[in-house]
Curated annotation (Swiss-Prot):
Belongs to the NadD family. It holds the Pfam family CTP_transf_like. The gene is nadD. The keyword Lyase does not apply. This is Probable nicotinate-nucleotide adenylyltransferase. Pathway: Cofactor biosynthesis; NAD(+) biosynthesis; deamido-NAD(+) from nicotinate D-ribonucleotide: step 1/1. GO terms for molecular function: ATP binding; nicotinate-nucleotide adenylyltransferase activity. It comes from Staphylococcus aureus (strain MRSA252). Catalyzes the reversible adenylation of nicotinate mononucleotide (NaMN) to nicotinic acid adenine dinucleotide (NaAD). Coiled coil: none annotated. SUPFAM superfamilies: Nucleotidylyl transferase.
Length: 189
C-alpha cells in the first residue's frame, strides 16, 4: 500500500517554516509520495493580500526544487471557491484507492478540528500528522501522529507585512522565492 502525505495550506507565500515542516514530516514518515496542497480559499481563514494563484504555485515549485522532493496537488485550485478538506480528500482518495493518506496540520488547525466540515468522516479517510507550530510539544488524539519540529516563528502574514514595509525577508523564505517576490512586486501595497 502506497503512503501518501498531503500538506495543505495557503502558502501565501510559502516560507522556511513550511520547508522545515515538509522536511521533518518527509524524513519521519518516508512516504512514497508527498504533495503540497495549496488551498484556493480556506473556510477558516481571513483572505487578505490575496495574490494570483499562479504566483503561489510558482513559489511552491521553487521550494519543491530546493527540497528535492514533492509535487503540487492543485485540486483545490482547479475547483476554485471555498475549499473543504473533506471534499478534496474524498476526491483524492477515489483516485488513489490503494493508498494510505496522511494529512499534515499545525497545532493551530488541530485546535480547530471540531469546526472542520465532516471532520468525523475525514478522520476515517486520513491519518492526521500534527506538527507543533505554536507549542514545544503537542498531545494528539489516538490515531493521529505528532511530530516535534524545531520551533520557528515565521508566518506568511509576517512576510507579507515585512515586504509591504520594505523590510528584508532574507532567510525567512528561500532565495529563489525572495527574488521572485521582489521581481514580481508581490505584497508591496
Amino acid at each position: 500500500m502506497k503512503r501518501i502525505v498531503l500538506y495543505g495550506g495557503q502558502f501565501n507565500p510559502i516560507h522556511t517554516a513550511h520547508m522545515i515542516v515538509a522536511s521533518e514530516v518527509f524524513h519521519e514518515l518516508q512516504p512514497d509520495e508527498f504533495y503540497f496542497l495549496p488551498s484556493f480559499m480556506s473556510p477558516l481563514k481571513k483572505h487578505h493580500d490575496f495574490i494570483d494563484v499562479q504566483h503561489r504555485l510558482t513559489m511552491i515549485q521553487m521550494v519543491i526544487d530546493e527540497l528535492g522532493f514533492g509535487d503540487i496537488c492543485d485540486d483545490e485550485i482547479k475547483r476554485g471557491g471555498q475549499s473543504y478538506t473533506y471534499d478534496t480528500i474524498k476526491a483524492f482518495k477515489e483516485q488513489h484507492k490503494d493508498s494510505e493518506l496522511y494529512f499534515v496540520i499545525g497545532t493551530d488547525q488541530y485546535n480547530q478540528l471540531e469546526k472542520w466540515y465532516q471532520i468525523e468522516y475525514l478522520k476515517e479517510m486520513v491519518t492526521f500528522v500534527v506538527v507543533n507550530r505554536d507549542k514545544n510539544s503537542q498531545n494528539v488524539e489516538n490515531g493521529m501522529i505528532a511530530i516535534q519540529i524545531p520551533r520557528v516563528d515565521i508566518s506568511s502574514t509576517m512576510i507579507r507585512q515585512r515586504v509591504s514595509k520594505g523590510k528584508s525577508i532574507q532567510v525567512l523564505v528561500p532565495k529563489s522565492v525572495e527574488n521572485y517576490i521582489k521581481g514580481e512586486g508581490l505584497y508591496e501595497h
